[in-house]
Amino acid sequence: MTERKIRVAALQEKAMPRSSVQEKLGRTLELIETASKDGCQIIVAGELCTSDYDRFYGTKDVSLFPEAEPIPGPSTEAVGKLTKKYKNYVIFPMFEKAAPGIYYNAAATIGPDGTVVGNYRKTHVAGVQVLEKLYFRAGQDFKVWETAFEPRARFGTIICHDRRYPETSRILAMLGAEMMFCPTAAPGYAGGVHWGVVNIARAVDTGMFCIYSNRVGPEGNKKYFGESMIVNPHGEVIATGGDRENAVIAADCDLALVDEARIAVPTLRDIRNDFYMKYYSKPSYDALI
């Protein structure tokens, strides 16, 4: 049987507070090139990688909106030049302007032909501590893509806060994903068990590779801890970024482990969606409203 292995990378970008979109983009393009030269076939950058995420906390900052771009647009075109050169995929998270007055926390997937082949919009927009709901609409869809090259790997994307909802990763798995990419911008309070334990749990829940990127370093009054990681379907961390700045965290993923994990613990086979729905249809927990 032909081996099904694919090399992936998470970019751990150093925060660049109050620098321009172009300056941040330049940093990310350099890291994409480094990862591509290392043979990485799917690369994920950090959440809102061309924006200062600390500015989404507190009072609404209307000066952020001019930074938003359409998808496709100038930034995705710049990334596309590299994916076309190296014949790989890049998941590029950004502040998307979908239409006048309509914005999303998005992650464009740019393919080997240099074009945008997909776009995921964050479905669980944070509304506690960081006030994303003042800026972004919630996405309404999950999708899985298949690589145009062998081993025809199937992958999907969620964004940061989405990972706290097991349904997000499980839906991707049920749609056929073997890998989940999750760009984040997680500062100190999102560390500890809220980071490693949750990230590992999503891999174990679904029996797939989970790749998490995070920024690192100070930005305004926030400090991002890095610790980007790649977790295999058995819940083993196979690569981590620690607190390194502008680092490429890469690993070779043997996709045979996906079936191995799902056969050993067949949660996807035994899931009872019809049973759960009678509870999901009831009012949500509202003690904090």
Name the predicted role of every residue range.
Residues M1-K5, G26, L288-I289:
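Basic/polar N-terminal segments that are highly enriched at the extreme N-terminus
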Residues T2-K14:
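Short beta-strand segments enriched in small/hydrophobic residues
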Residues R18-P112, N119, A186-T206:
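Cys-nucleophile CN-hydrolase/nitrilase-fold catalytic domain and related Cys-dependent amidase chemistry
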Residues S51, R55, A108, Y120-A126, ...:
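Short beta->alpha transition motifs characteristic of CBS
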Residues A68-E69, K81, A98-M179, P187-A201, ...:
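Active-site catalytic loop in hydrolytic enzyme cores
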Residues I71-I91, R154, C160-I249:
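CN hydrolase (nitrilase-like) catalytic-core segments centered on the catalytic cysteine
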Residues F92-M94, A106-T109, K143, S228-I230, ...:
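Short beta-strand scaffold segments in enzyme catalytic cores
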Residues A256-I289:
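A short C-terminal boundary segment appended to hydrolase-like catalytic domains
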